[in-house]
Design a protein with these regions (language model features):
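Hydrophobic core of transmembrane alpha-helices in multi-pass small-molecule transporters
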Residues: 40, 120-136, 241, 319-332
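Extracytoplasmic gate region of multi-pass secondary transporters
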Residues: 50-54, 229-287
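Helix-to-loop junctions at the C-terminal end of transmembrane segments
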Residues: 82-95, 282-294, 376
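C-terminal ends and interior cores of transmembrane alpha-helices
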Residues: 104-117, 304-315
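Intracellular juxtamembrane helix-capping segments at the cytosolic ends
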Residues: 135-149, 332-345
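Helix-loop-helix hairpin linking two adjacent transmembrane segments in secondary transporters
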Residues: 159-210
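A late C-terminal transmembrane helix in Major Facilitator Superfamily
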Residues: 168, 347-380
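C-terminal transmembrane helical hairpin of 12-TM major facilitator-type secondary transporters
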Residues: 275, 279, 292-340
């Protein structure tokens, strides 16, 4: 080294980026099942609730249906705003306290909703539920698992998403039956009690303490990616956002779109019901396929989604098959969201960035019902489907770009 060049002191861990403590042993099958059940409970009491509760609420209160459905968009927007903070709290304190508290926060929102007799209080309830969603849904859980188990978290994520894939299949008929017998307000109270009694004790029992990340004392600046390649970061973020938009549009508008294509309401509902089992089936097949780089799962996800949408759009006689193909692809989305970033960046960065990467997805989900409603009103079912096909094609192109990065370097930091 030339004499006139000063020797640089070694950088500390916080200057280089976040670092992790020792990882824990992977959870056993029973723990994975319990974590999946907990996700079903929290998803069912938040994101999936409005699908069966919005109409009874609107009929009972007289509030405009667009405001009732808009409450879910509000909760998603709140969750989007808080998602980066959620990941940072997981990194600083470990995920167990936050995951355990998430059920209680959603429960408080449900209790406020049950007591709401004004639209303003109802919207406040969903803002509180949005806080609980940021604390306890997939992104927070994936960050928690990454902090606890490092690269080994992939196995747990796959198993948990397999079980949690039954969230809508189980929660919709259960909540609908409860509303029929007890009314929507009593159903909210009962669901809140279940969350308060079950979620915190089980999370505290199943998740080990720890998983904290040594983070910089200064909050990372906006747009900072903590040493992760910026182009890769935005490629992954864009992929997940587009996937979330497509999923939300289908979840909200599929029945109406199918009716617009000429199917009766019972047939449309029957076709839509095929999505849940096909999503779970694809996750089972992914497990049976064995260990491989998740970029191949990502390619299967976006390809099947595109093929399924094209079949529904252009081959009316193959609508049922197209929805099965779409469901198989969409079922892989949650697995890819958890596994692909973990394979492309060190676990410590993964813990901190999961929440930030989810923000565009959540904002897109919040805006999708409004934009989708506009497209459906002005351009009909074909307008909605063609837009979704273009988005799905874009995702295929994005995955091919990421695949080139994987072949060049299995991990890009």
């Amino acid at each position: 080294m030339p004499a006139n060049r000063p020797v640089q002191p070694p950088r500390t861990a916080t200057e280089i980026g976040p670092t992790l403590h020792t990882y824990h042993r992977l959870p056993g099958p029973l723990s994975i099942v319990l974590l999946g059940v907990l996700q079903i409970l929290v998803w069912g009491g938040s994101f999936f609730l409005m699908a069966v509760m919005a109409d009874p609420i609107s009929r009972d209160t007289g509030w405009p249906s667009q405001w009732v459905y808009g409450a879910l968009s509000l909760s998603l927007m709140v969750s989007a705003l808080l998602a980066p903070l959620s990941s940072r709290l997981v990194a600083r304190y470990g995920g167990r306290p936050q995951m355990a508290a998430s059920g209680a926060v959603v429960a408080v929102g449900l209790l406020i909703m049950a007591a709401s007799h004004t639209l303003g209080l109802f919207l406040l309830a969903w803002a509180v539920i949005g806080i609980g969603m940021a604390m306890g849904l997939y992104e927070a859980l994936f960050a928690t698992l990454g902090g606890l188990y490092g690269e080994g978290a992939g196995k747990a994520i796959t198993g948990i998403t397999l079980i949690a894939g039954f969230a809508s299949t189980l929660s919709w008929p259960t909540v609908a039956l409860a509303i029929e017998h007890f009314g929507w307000r009593a159903t909210c109270v009962c669901y809140a009690l279940v969350l308060m009694v079950v979620v915190a004790p089980l999370y505290w029992r199943v998740l080990p303490a720890g998983g904290r990340v040594e983070v910089p004392a200064k909050t990372p600046a906006k747009g900072e990616t903590l040493g992760v390649d910026r182009q890769l970061y935005w490629l992954l973020t864009s992929m997940f956002a587009i996937g979330a938009i497509i999923m939300t549009a289908i979840a909200v508008q599929l029945v109406a779109v199918l009716q617009g294509l000429g199917h009766s309401l019972p047939v449309a509902i029957g076709l839509a019901a095929m999505l849940g089992p096909s999503q779970v089936a694809s996750r089972v097949l992914q497990i049976l396929a064995g260990k491989r780089h998740p970029i191949w799962t990502a390619l299967a996800w976006v390809s099947l989604v595109l093929i399924g949408l094209l079949m529904v759009t252009f081959i009316p006689a193959a609508t049922a098959v197209g929805l099965l193909v779409f469901g198989c692809g969409n079922g892989l989305r949650a697995i890819v969201r958890g596994l692909l970033p973990l394979a492309m960046m060190p676990p410590a960065q993964y813990v901190l960035l999961m929440g930030r990467m989810s923000r565009p997805s959540l904002i897109g989900q919040a805006l999708t019902p409004v934009v989708g409603g506009f497209l459906f009103e002005h351009f009909g079912s074909m307008g909605v489907l063609l837009t979704l096909c273009l988005l799905a094609l874009t995702n295929v192109l994005l995955v091919t770009v990421v695949m080139r990065r994987v072949r060049a370097a299995p991990r890009v930091v």
